[in-house]
Amino acid sequence: IGDRAFHRDARVANMLAKSLMHGLLRAGMANCGKHFPGHGFVQADSHHAVPVDKRSLKAILADDAKPYDWLSTSLASVMPAHVVYPKVDALPAGFSARWLKQILRGDLGFQGAIFSDDLSMEGAKVAGSAVDGALAALNAGCDMVLLCNQSIDGGQAVDALLDGLQTAQASGRWHPDGDSEARR
């Protein structure tokens, strides 16, 4: 993540994040903590590859994810990483109910909205198509899904995504969650 991160030290990152969140709030803007549980220990860029972080859950929670624990009541939203943490789950965090429902919502007590990262990124393609990625993200605990880098097709990708979600709902592959609806 390099220069896109506040700092290597979780305490410093926490202080800087609090300052940014305060400034955003004063300007009338919401905040989003990203990329849960952390993106700092991988070399690969999830825009172009599928990063893998082989650390244990204990190590991740003690380091990268620590600011999420400290800031869970202050964050308006969180965006999970398209990173695989195989010692925790075989799926990238954004497609993992263990990361989103059990750890982020359950263990850390986060109650805000969860946005997927861009489903057109290479790191998201492990789920398959954009529709498959959206279903995986929504079923794992995301409240909203993002398809950001498809603007050159005149909206066809977004239309296909919406059609796919409607078909999935009609066939029972996806059921909108009432709690998730309320967070939107």
Task: Please give the residue ranges for each predicted region.
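Second-shell residues forming the walls of enzyme active-site clefts
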Residues: 8-175
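Short, intrinsically disordered, charge-balanced linker/junction segments flanking boundaries
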Residues: 175-184
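A glycine-rich phosphate/pyrophosphate-binding beta-strand-loop-alpha-helix module
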Residues: 1-4
